[in-house]
Amino acid sequence: MGCANSSQVNAQDHAAADKDTTKSNDPIVLQRADPFIYKHTDGYYYFTGSVPTYDAIEIRRAKTIEGLQNAEPFTVWEKHESGPMSRHIWAPEIHYLDGKWYVYFAASEEDDIWALRPYVLELKGQDPLKDEWVELGMMQAADDDPKSFTDFSLDGTVFEHNGKRYFCWAEKTGGQFAASNLYLAEMESPIKLKTVQFMLTTPDYDWERIDFWVNEGAAVIKNEGKIYITFSASATGASYAMGMMEADENADLLDRNSWIKSRYPVLETNEEKDIYGPGHNSFTVDENGDPIMIYHARDYEKAVGDPKMVPATDKRPLEEIKADPLYDPNRHARMMEVKFDNDGRPVFEFY
């Protein structure tokens, strides 16, 4: 398969090296939640994430991760005025599959702001910043799958393993206030699933159930014969935290018995370092080839929603809106070196 240099990371392929990069918890890109970086074979890092207004998809690129901070952002697609893809443009990811560029993102409708579904863009060309992106429509379930993408669905990511390509996404069942679970399926094409959805994880523990029952924002890293899928849990404020699933590299990824889930968060708020609600991460490698995690977090505890970001169809009282961290724009993209314990498991530690 033609995934030239995926955002998934094979950590064992990268020898440790001394880093020239200054280690810091400071943001690399301001006000970009759900950050995603793809390092392509052209030597560029391609960055995207949720813009604060949730109304467009931006991409920037640079030769270094740090260079992304000052790289010019290009708006490559904007929301529709009404109907599908007209509200809540969330968590875009850029991937290179079978010689073509794709963007996966979630979107809802102006008149139904929680009707989120995963959508796909395809590039007609090879320059993601300048060539035309066209809409392929909503991600499609397998022919024998009546459930996938029929309810609140978001945070889709793509990865390859043992010659197969997979799509992992979050979906609620039973309406807006039901649990958000993570699902996994093999892909038939960049826009369609091949297999029926498999529920990878549901919010089992108290730390996954703060304000909302949430598992979302999956990302993949591999090391020493294991595949790991990190995810984020709870509401988008200071309670937001990361968990992790692991499986043997030769296991059937669509078998529940293949996976072990972390009982506790692998990354959470650190008040001493003023890092609140870390999560919705992605993985890449730095210029030395060492694994790096990109994540978002705020630098204060109490998020304050900006009424200007709220859809006109959201009729909640102003005080309730101001208390909603979803509409606080200051989730900043940050980076972290990925370390490994004696058993080869990823360890995530602030500097």
Predicted regions and their residues:
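Carbohydrate-active catalytic/glycan-binding domains of CAZyme proteins
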Residues: 3-351
